[in-house]
Amino acid sequence: MISREEHAQGLTLVTVSDIGSNHRALLLPNQDSVDFIIDGEDFVLAVSDGVGSCPKAELGSKEAVASCIRVFTLIKNRIIEFESDNVVDALINEWRVSLDHENLDDCCATLKAIFKIGQVMKVVSVGDGFIAVSSDGLNLLSPTEEMAFSNETSCLCSRIEPRDFWTSDFNLDTHKPYAAFCCTDGVANGLVTQFSHKDRNN
């Protein structure tokens, strides 16, 4: 298991990733990727799961997460506007460019990302897994797919289009506590029902 925790500006960001039992038994690499960066009171948190049937899925997920970090930097540097369409277009472009010498369909991956800029938390999702945000009695939950472990999810691939992404904005009162959670399908399958029917207080 790989874990990372960082504290800054009143934020606590934690990431945990572990290789699945099937991949461990077959001596295959961990296809999950996760990363975050904090810049002042703003941050990006991203998690990606390589689609198991693709031979370079771990590379696809790694570059999906890295693309989120690069897009966050573009936003902070005011190179692109913090609008959903711009963020999604930039993510797709960054992912494709980073894999320019690869067959994109060998590198398929899902993606869940949270971009927090100022008082707006923008969530971006393609494929299975889910994102949940909660603050002051308000909750946001991304759509979920009922195709657990089937390798039949929407994903970053050669045919990916902006309309394949789900996006939403969550407006924060930054003086009040909030929690944000994003995970891949392995965790989502066990938690999504609970998040759908219960408020989580932190």
Over which residues does each language-model region extend?
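PP2C/PPM-type serine/threonine phosphatase catalytic domain
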Residues: 1-202
